[in-house]
């Protein structure tokens, strides 16, 4: 296995593969992660649940410069020294109390910190090799694999042979072009300007917040990168040349007056709403920003990349380990494309009401911006219904309610989370492979039938007891529901691993022996 690119998507893919014992090499051109450009800052509750599975959620929280307890708020104001307009509490899934809806709260943390934590993690995984300073240059496919030309440190060139390649090399990487895919979509005509600055002596009287949206003559966003005086700012509508020449004036206006500060870095950028016309060519898969670009408003971009990596990661592991059909991989694009389309649409909707577009009126701001800061419906409520490996009567996904999350046991949905009486998460009881979740104490012959079938097919299956009045759920390694039935024997394992196409007859295998797994 070869992972091209060691940013968030590539590191997440390596973590997923390494968790499952699949050997892989990760090529990453950057020897070190730069902390001058923080990029994404929102790690969603869903991504934190994946980090929990990998065993690094606590490590990320320990490394995060802003503890969740410090603030869970987004504040709108005239300036950081001026009038408060309104607040959004528990933004981005930030909470210090347990919530039955998810196993992990969100975390505000700069992307470079996430990358550092994941780099350290995958370097400890047996069979995962992170080659820093190495970049892919060419990909040539044949029936048996992919030959990848690599440029190593010092310019040395060599080839790697891989059965599958995950292209996680972003917008400017080579993978998308090498397979002949292209972005389809548009770019926002407005420029944007980012600034990182140091102002150790400044503190706002508005109280702690993970973001301050300034609605004034100079409008934009400001936030802390740490609690030691490092700040970031985003000023929409500012050209690069003007921003570079007037950065100090812009900072002064946002803060509400002259404040001693030091400019650390600046970064002009443009928002893109782009999705590749295909996510796969035979043995090469596009993952993360190589497959899609979306505006940062709502904090979904980085998290969507992680979701891609998890989806293809467990599937390739299943194929490599011999318990799933290669046809399982055909489900990657249909499952993830729908999620990506919904996410890009939500981010674009958020972009229609940036700081300069909003009136300084609390109720109006609440109405316009609630879907941006309270988006659990999108983060947790997306479904893989209609997938070729999900036993669902639906042939499509209904649009999600971005704000409101309604737990569902419909096939394709994420398994509804709950905290168990002993204090553990239901998710901690799931296995690395598939899990049968249901009323095992009244198991009947169906549970043994399914367990025996899984054993015959070498499909890893864990048994998880649940409420007596619930149906049986076949839960995938990514915590999404593959099938639901009143009798466990009616759950279609063959469909879930790509061995049978939807609509064909499933043949049950009966057995008189009981499983004690």
Where are these regions (language model features)?
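A conserved beta-strand/loop element that lines the FAD pocket in flavoprotein oxidoreductases
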Residues: 122-136
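Conserved FAD-binding catalytic core of PHBH/FMO-like flavoproteins
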Residues: 60, 120, 164, 168-271
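Conserved mid-domain beta->alpha element of the FAD-binding
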Residues: 6-16, 118, 167, 263-349, ...
């Amino acid at each position: 296995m070869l992972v091209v690119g060691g940013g968030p998507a590539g590191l997440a893919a390596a973590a997923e593969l390494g968790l499952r014992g699949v050997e892989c090499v990760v090529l990453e051109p950057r020897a070190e992660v730069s902390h001058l450009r923080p990029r994404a800052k929102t790690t969603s509750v869903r991504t934190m649940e994946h980090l929990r599975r990998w065993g690094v959620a606590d490590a990320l929280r320990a490394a995060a410069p802003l503890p969740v307890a410090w603030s869970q708020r987004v504040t709108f104001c005239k300036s950081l020294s001026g009038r408060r307009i309104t607040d959004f509490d528990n933004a981005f899934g930030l909470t210090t109390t347990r919530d039955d809806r998810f196993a992990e709260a969100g975390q505000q943390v700069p992307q470079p910190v996430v990358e550092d934590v994941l780099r350290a993690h995958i370097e400890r995984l047996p069979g995962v090799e992170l080659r820093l300073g190495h970049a892919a240059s060419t990909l040539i496919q044949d029936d048996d694999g992919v030959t990848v030309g690599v440029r190593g440190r010092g310019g040395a060139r060599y080839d790697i042979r891989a059965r599958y390649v995950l292209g996680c090399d972003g917008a400017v990487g080579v993978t998308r072009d090498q397979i002949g895919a292209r972005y389809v979509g548009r770019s926002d005509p407005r420029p944007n300007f980012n600034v990182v600055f140091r102002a150790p002596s400044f503190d706002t009287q508005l109280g702690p917040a993970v973001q301050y949206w300034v609605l004034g003559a100079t409008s934009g966003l400001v936030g802390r990168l740490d609690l030691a005086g490092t700040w970031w700012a985003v000023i929409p509508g500012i050209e690069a040349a003007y921003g570079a020449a007037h950065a100090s004036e812009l900072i002064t206006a946002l803060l509400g007056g002259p404040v001693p500060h030091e400019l650390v870095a600046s970064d002009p950028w443009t928002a893109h709403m782009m999705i590749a016309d295909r996510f796969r060519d035979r043995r090469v898969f596009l993952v993360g920003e190589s497959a899609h670009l979306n505006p940062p408003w709502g904090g979904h971009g980085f998290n969507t990349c992680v979701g891609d990596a998890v989806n293809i990661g467990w599937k390739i592991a299943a194929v490599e380990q011999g318990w799933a059909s290669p046809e399982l991989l055909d489900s990657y694009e249909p499952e993830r494309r729908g999620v990506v389309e919904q996410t890009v649409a939500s981010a674009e909707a958020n972009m229609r009401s940036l700081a300069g577009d909003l009136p300084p009126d609390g109720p109006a701001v609440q109405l316009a911006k609630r879907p941006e800061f309270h988006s659990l419906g999108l983060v947790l409520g997306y479904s893989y219904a209609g997938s070729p490996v999900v036993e669902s009567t639906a042939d499509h996904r209904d649009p999600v309610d971005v704000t409101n999350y309604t737990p569902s046991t419909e096939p394709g949905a994420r398994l509804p989370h709950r905290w168990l009486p002993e204090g553990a998460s239901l998710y901690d009881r799931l296995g690395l492979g598939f899990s049968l979740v249901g009323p095992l104490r009244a198991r009947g012959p169906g549970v043994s039938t399914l367990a025996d079938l899984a054993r015959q097919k070498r499909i890893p299956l864990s048994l998880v007891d649940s409420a007596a009045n619930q149906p049986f759920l076949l839960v995938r390694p990514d915590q999404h529901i593959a099938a639901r039935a009143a009798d466990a024997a009616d759950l279609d394992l063959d469909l879930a691993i790509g061995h049978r196409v939807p609509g064909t007859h499933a043949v049950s295998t009966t057995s008189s022996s009981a499983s004690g797994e």
